[in-house]
């Protein structure tokens, strides 16, 4: 039962990531949203997001 629950949660997380990637692929690419790969040679992050120097993707700006 415990393994089934963990597998279900991992599957759901994978589904959400794939759905997000499909949505990003359909956008016009002017700016990057959450978890968008950013940095040199890549589109800038959208308003409300900042490029994380540690991870190299767009994250929510700290207040």
From Swiss-Prot:
The keyword Disulfide bond applies. GO terms for molecular function: ion channel inhibitor activity; potassium channel regulator activity; sodium channel regulator activity; toxin activity. InterPro entries: Huwentoxin-1. Keywords: Disulfide bond, Ion channel impairing toxin, Knottin, Neurotoxin, Potassium channel impairing toxin, Secreted, Signal, Toxin, Voltage-gated potassium channel impairing toxin, Voltage-gated sodium channel impairing toxin. GO terms for cellular component: extracellular region. The keyword 4Fe-4S does not apply. It is found in: Secreted. It holds the Pfam family Toxin_12. It comes from the Eukaryota. Disulfide bonds join 31-46, 38-51, 45-58. Expressed by the venom gland. Selectively inhibits activation of voltage-gated sodium channels (VGSC) (Nav1.5/SCN5A) in rat cardiac myocytes, followed by shifting activated voltage in a depolarizing direction. The binding site on VGSC is suggested to be site 4 located at the extracellular S3-S4 loop of the channel. Also binds to voltage-gated potassium channels (Kv2.1/KCNB1). The presence of a 'disulfide through disulfide knot' structurally defines this protein as a knottin. Belongs to the neurotoxin 10 (Hwtx-1) family. 44 (Jztx-4) subfamily. This is Beta/kappa-theraphotoxin-Cg1a. It comes from Chilobrachys guangxiensis.
């Amino acid at each position: 039962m415990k393994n089934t629950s963990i597998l279900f949660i991992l599957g759901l997380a994978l589904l959400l990531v794939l759905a997000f990637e499909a949505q990003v692929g359909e956008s016009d690419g002017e700016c990057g949203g959450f978890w968008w790969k950013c940095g040199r040679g890549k589109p800038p992050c959208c308003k409300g997001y900042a490029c994380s120097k540690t991870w190299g993707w767009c994250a929510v700006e700290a207040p």
